[in-house]
Amino acid sequence: MGVIAAIKPNGWVDKTVSMIASLGVAIPGFWLAMILVAEISLKLNWLPATGAKSFSVSPWEAIRHALLPGIAIAAYGMAEVARQLRGSLLEVLSSQYVRTLHAKGLSMTRILWQHGLKNVSVNLFTIISLLVNRMLAATVVIEAVFAIPGMGSLIVRGAIQRDFPIVQGVVFAMVIVVIAVNLIADLLCAAVDPRIEQ
């Protein structure tokens, strides 16, 4: 969405994408989760409101149960990525060297994929790594709303029952995920922009 908005700034697509992205950033995940449960599950009865199914037992049911929690967790991240990508791409596409590439006869698609996205990818990897960390924290609340037996509900149950080894184990697992994601993001940034290695 951010790429589409950046290609034609100030058009109706850009304004629509910006409005949706602003809403996605502004709405808290737990509130969006409750709206999804009330409207899509209880009112329309399209998807299940609570629980989770194993993918090995029933792939279709597993997808149906994971859809609403996935939307609730990912909405903020998708909106933030769209906003940041739009802003970064607008800056790159309005730069002098992009005008030179246009003058040389390169198509907009080629400029976008070979030059534009490459230049904004460092920002993109950094934002995504930060959003993964935020999503880990959001799972605690989202799992409570959808009654999903996951790491978030496990750490809450462990804290309530004062089961400190469980809490330490979950925190340790989350720390490993955060470190791994940040390391991968740093390696990708260094691969895209060799100046970062120096």
Regions found by a protein language model. Give the residues of each.
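Short clusters of hydrophobic/aromatic residues that line enzyme substrate/ligand-binding pockets
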Residues: 47, 52
